[in-house]
Amino acid sequence: MNPLISAASVIAAGLSVGLASIGPGIGQGTAAGQAVEGIARQPEAEGKIRGTLLLSLAFMEALTIYGLVVALALLFANPFV
C-alpha cells in the first residue's frame, strides 16, 4: 500500500467529517433558536413546533451521517488501494 495514498485517505476522511458537520451544525442552531422564539410567541403551538423541529433536526443530522459514511469508506474500504 502506498503511504501517500494512506495519508491522503486519512486527511480526506477527517475533512469529510469536519466539512459535513459545519452546515448542519449551523442549521440546527438556527432552527432551534427559531423554534424557541416561536414557542415563546405562541405557547399553545408548542407541540406542533417541537414535532416539526425534531423532524427537521433529523434531516439535518442525516447530512453529517453521510459525511461519516464517506469517511469510513475512505478508511476501511478504500477504493484507491
From Swiss-Prot:
Species in which this protein is naturally found: Cryptomeria japonica
Family affiliation: Belongs to the ATPase C chain family.
Name of the protein: ATP synthase subunit c, chloroplastic
Membrane-protein topology: Multi-pass membrane protein
Keyword Chloroplast (UniProt): yes
UniProtKB keywords: ATP synthesis, CF(0), Chloroplast, Hydrogen ion transport, Ion transport, Lipid-binding, Membrane, Plastid, Thylakoid, Transmembrane, Transmembrane helix, Transport
Role played: F(1)F(0) ATP synthase produces ATP from ADP in the presence of a proton or sodium gradient. F-type ATPases consist of two structural domains, F(1) containing the extramembraneous catalytic core and F(0) containing the membrane proton channel, linked together by a central stalk and a peripheral stalk. During catalysis, ATP synthesis in the catalytic domain of F(1) is coupled via a rotary mechanism of the central stalk subunits to proton translocation. Key component of the F(0) channel; it plays a direct role in translocation across the membrane. A homomeric c-ring of between 10-14 subunits forms the central stalk rotor element with the F(1) delta and epsilon subunits.
Subcellular location: Plastid, Chloroplast thylakoid membrane
GO cellular component, one term: chloroplast thylakoid membrane
Organism superkingdom: Eukaryota
Record's miscellaneous remark: In plastids the F-type ATPase is also known as CF(1)CF(0).
Subunit record text: F-type ATPases have 2 components, F(1) - the catalytic core - and F(0) - the membrane proton channel. F(1) has five subunits: alpha(3), beta(3), gamma(1), delta(1), epsilon(1). F(0) has four main subunits: a(1), b(1), b'(1) and c(10-14). The alpha and beta chains form an alternating ring which encloses part of the gamma chain. F(1) is attached to F(0) by a central stalk formed by the gamma and epsilon chains, while a peripheral stalk is formed by the delta, b and b' chains.
Transmembrane segments: 7-27, 57-77
Annotated site (Reversibly protonated during proton transport): E61
SUPFAM superfamilies for this protein: F1F0 ATP synthase subunit C (SSF81333)
Stored InterPro entries: ATP_synth_csu_bac/chlpt, ATP_synth_F0_csu, ATP_synth_F0_csu_DDCD_BS, ATP_synth_F0_csu_sf, ATPase_proteolipid_c-like_dom, F/V-ATP_Csub_sf
Main localization of the protein described in the UniProt heading: plastid
Molecular function via GO: lipid binding; proton-transporting ATP synthase activity, rotational mechanism
Pfam families reported in the protein's UniProt record: ATP-synt_C (PF00137)
HAMAP family documented for this protein: ATP_synth_c_bact
